[in-house]
C-alpha cells in the first residue's frame, strides 16, 4: 500500500491518528509540512527516526525545490535526491501530486528506489512549468526523456 498525503489530521495528535495505518504502508510520502505536523521534527532524518517504530517500509519526505529525502527502513539506507531544476517555473500547484504519481509509476515499472525518486522529481519539475495542476506530461516516456535532457539521469 502507498500512503500519499492529505489525511487532514488535527494538530497535536497527527501521529496518533495515522499510526494504525503506517504498519500497512509501504511508501509513506508526506510533504515537509505534513511530516513536520506528524513528527514535530524539522530535519528529515529526525522525522525518519520518529516514524521508524511504526512499521512503514519507506519514508519519503518531499522538500519542494530542494528535492526529497528517503529512508528505506528495510535496508537501513537513506538518500537525498535533488530536485530536477525547472527552467521556467510557473506554479507549484500539483507538484507534490505529480511527484507521488511519478514515484508510483516508476515503482510499478520495476524501477529501483533511487531511480524512482529521480523519475518522481522529473515529473514534479515538469508540473511546475505549467499554469495548472494537470497536463504537464502525457506518458512515462515523456518524463524519462525530460529527466535525461534536464540532468542526464538514466533509468
List where the protein language model places each region.
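Conserved phosphate-binding/catalytic region of the ribokinase-like
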Residues: 11, 44-155
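Conserved beta-alpha-beta core of the PfkB/ribokinase-like small-molecule kinase fold
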Residues: 1-49, 66-68
Amino acid at each position: 500500500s502507498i500512503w500519499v498525503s492529505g489525511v487532514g489530521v488535527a494538530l497535536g495528535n497527527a501521529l496518533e491518528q495515522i499510526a494504525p495505518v503506517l504498519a500497512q504502508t509501504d511508501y509513506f510520502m508526506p510533504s515537509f509540512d505534513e511530516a513536520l505536523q506528524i513528527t514535530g521534527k524539522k530535519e528529515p532524518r529526525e522525522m525518519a527516526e520518529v516514524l521508524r517504530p511504526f512499521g512503514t517500509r519507506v519514508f519519503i519526505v518531499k522538500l519542494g525545490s530542494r528535492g526529497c529525502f528517503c529512508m528505506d527502513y528495510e535496508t537501513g539506507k537513506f538518500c537525498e535526491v535533488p530536485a530536477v531544476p525547472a527552467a521556467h517555473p510557473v506554479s507549484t500547484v500539483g507538484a507534490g501530486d505529480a511527484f507521488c504519481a511519478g514515484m508510483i509509476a516508476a515503482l510499478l515499472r520495476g524501477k529501483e528506489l533511487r531511480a524512482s525518486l529521480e523519475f518522481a522529481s522529473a515529473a514534479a519539475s515538469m508540473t511546475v512549468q505549467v499554469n495548472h495542476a494537470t497536463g504537464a506530461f502525457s506518458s512515462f516516456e515523456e518524463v524519462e526523456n525530460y529527466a535525461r535532457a534536464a540532468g542526464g539521469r538514466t533509468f
